[in-house]
Amino acid sequence: VAVFPNGTESKASNEISSSLVSGIPVITNVSIRTTSVTNGSVYISWMKPGRLDTIPANGPYEYLIYRAEGITGTDYQQIRSIRTATLNETSIIDTLINTRDKGYIYRIELYNNAPGNRFLIGEPGYASSLFLTASPGDEKVRFVINRNVPWLNSRYDFYRLNSSTMRYDSIGSTNQLTYTDLGLENGKEYCYRIRSVGGYVPDDLPKNLINYSQIVCATPEDNEPPCQPVITVTSQCDSLYNTIRWRFDDPECIDDV
């Protein structure tokens, strides 16, 4: 467990990576632009495929973009097609979806689209959005970061809405997938979003990839049972009463009454 100067803490976890095939559309962004139940939007971008053998695949080309609900979803639906002669059209904005309550995974396929010579080039590219879940506790909010991407995220930056300025202030960073914001006020709503920073391992693939999660809000509450004290009982044979003493071994439990 890592503990930060402002009292936040987190637990370690491993990032997921995958090998890449020549001709694959290398996805670089699946970033939440708008958090909404009905009007959410996601920015998706990818790198123009490198090392493309243009002898069998001399174009024109077509990108097919698919989406599935959930960061590990498998029920893909096509949401967009892009016909191109240059392969330079490498981004879309997916709109009118529920980004507040759901994460999404995207698949991008590249086809040679010549008449009589249409075929899939390489392998599809896959990457999910960054989905943040929050669990309120006593004067705290616990978070779990969910993602399914082919690059390595080296850092997650946490931001909390400042109710005075209505801007999101940085409250800490972690390279792990759980995080706790401590020292909060019970009964007050707090809103958060996170930014991931990462990149692909191979030298010829993109670094410094930045993506954002949805906005998630939570209200801390005293929903945790008090700490169990260590109890000792002493008595004297000629006395009609017992003396009961208790103590807390965890310093954080001293005020938990």
Write out the residue ranges for each language-model feature.
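Short, solvent-exposed loop/linker segments at the N-terminal edge
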Residues: 34-39, 133-137, 234-239
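Conserved aromatic anchor
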Residues: 40-58, 94, 139-153, 240-254
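Surface-exposed, proline-enriched loop/turn segments that connect beta strands in immunoglobulin-like
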Residues: 28-33, 228-233
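Recognizes extended acidic, P/S/T-rich segments that occur
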Residues: 58-101, 155-187, 205-208, 256-257
